[in-house]
């Protein structure tokens, strides 16, 4: 599974990138707003930190304007993935963009039918929103499983990018089902390494080592 971080905070991105575990970044208009910086400026800096795909979202809702904005975003860096909404105009833009060799992340997916259309449109990534589906009282992981089955049935190349992740359990379940990518808030990504028994075991090892009076090297 690939790990993307879902943020426009360059300090968080830089810290996580230094671990060698980060495969990409996703942003959206809300995250850009939280950064307090111009979209082109902050996205360019993110692309300089991360070698993998960096999703930058269009804000237009009609095909012509989506394509205009996509052209601007694409010029930021070669690793930009254009993020488009799962609408008919968004799918039309997806088809046009991927046909010209650009990466596209189709976002705001809430059904397997939508995911099927995105794959038909040649999407590089499909972003089903797990947490928001859970908020409706429906198990978001069922959607991931349905998409995985459909994509496997037809050998679609579109990667399932599990989004709206709220917990480490979301990450685990998405990995078990077979999502290709999990885009995770920084706090959740950092929490994946934590376990109380790991901390307890390390504490015991260090205490015993201190009793030996030894040093390595």
From Swiss-Prot:
<dbReference type="GO" id="GO:0005737">
    <property type="term" value="C:cytoplasm"/>
</dbReference>
<feature type="active site" description="Schiff-base intermediate with substrate">
    <location>
        <position position="83"/>
    </location>
</feature>
<comment type="similarity">
    <text>Belongs to the transaldolase family. Type 3B subfamily.</text>
</comment>
<dbReference type="GO" id="GO:0005975">
    <property type="term" value="P:carbohydrate metabolic process"/>
</dbReference>
<protein>
    <recommendedName>
        <fullName>Probable transaldolase</fullName>
        <ecNumber>2.2.1.2</ecNumber>
    </recommendedName>
</protein>
<dbReference type="InterPro" id="IPR013785">
    <property type="entry name" value="Aldolase_TIM"/>
</dbReference>
<comment type="pathway">
    <text>Carbohydrate degradation; pentose phosphate pathway; D-glyceraldehyde 3-phosphate and beta-D-fructose 6-phosphate from D-ribose 5-phosphate and D-xylulose 5-phosphate (non-oxidative stage): step 2/3.</text>
</comment>
<dbReference type="GO" id="GO:0004801">
    <property type="term" value="F:transaldolase activity"/>
</dbReference>
<dbReference type="Pfam" id="PF00923">
    <property type="entry name" value="TAL_FSA"/>
</dbReference>
<dbReference type="InterPro" id="IPR004731">
    <property type="entry name" value="Transaldolase_3B/F6P_aldolase"/>
</dbReference>
<keyword id="KW-0808">Transferase</keyword>
<dbReference type="GO" id="GO:0016832">
    <property type="term" value="F:aldehyde-lyase activity"/>
</dbReference>
<dbReference type="InterPro" id="IPR018225">
    <property type="entry name" value="Transaldolase_AS"/>
</dbReference>
<keyword id="KW-0704">Schiff base</keyword>
<keyword id="KW-0963">Cytoplasm</keyword>
<dbReference type="InterPro" id="IPR001585">
    <property type="entry name" value="TAL/FSA"/>
</dbReference>
<comment type="function">
    <text>Transaldolase is important for the balance of metabolites in the pentose-phosphate pathway.</text>
</comment>
<dbReference type="GO" id="GO:0006098">
    <property type="term" value="P:pentose-phosphate shunt"/>
</dbReference>
<dbReference type="InterPro" id="IPR033919">
    <property type="entry name" value="TSA/FSA_arc/bac"/>
</dbReference>
<keyword id="KW-0570">Pentose shunt</keyword>
<dbReference type="InterPro" id="IPR022999">
    <property type="entry name" value="Transaldolase_3B"/>
</dbReference>
């Amino acid at each position: 599974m690939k790990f993307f971080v879902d943020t426009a905070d360059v300090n968080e991105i830089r810290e996580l990138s230094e671990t060698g575990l980060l495969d990409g970044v996703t942003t959206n208009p809300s995250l850009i707003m939280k950064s307090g910086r111009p979209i082109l400026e902050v996205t360019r800096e993110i692309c300089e930190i991360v070698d993998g795909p960096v999703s930058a979202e269009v804000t237009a809702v009609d095909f012509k304007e989506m394509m205009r904005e996509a052209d601007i975003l694409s010029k930021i860096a070669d690793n930009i993935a254009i993020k488009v909404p799962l609408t008919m105009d968004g799918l039309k833009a997806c088809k046009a963009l991927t046909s010209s060799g650009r990466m596209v992340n189709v976002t705001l997916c809430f059904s397997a039918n939508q995911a099927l259309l995105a794959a038909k449109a040649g999407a590089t990534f499909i972003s089903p929103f797990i947490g928001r589906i859970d908020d409706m009282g429906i198990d978001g992981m069922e959607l991931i499983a349905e998409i995985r089955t459909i994509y496997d049935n037809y050998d679609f190349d579109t990667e399932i990018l599990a989004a709206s992740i709220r917990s480490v359990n979301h990450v685990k379940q998405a990995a078990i089902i077979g999502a290709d990518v999990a885009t995770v808030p920084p706090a959740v990504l950092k929490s994946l390494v934590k376990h109380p028994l790991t901390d307890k075991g390390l504490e015991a090892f260090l205490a015993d080592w201190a009793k030996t009076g030894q040093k390595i090297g």
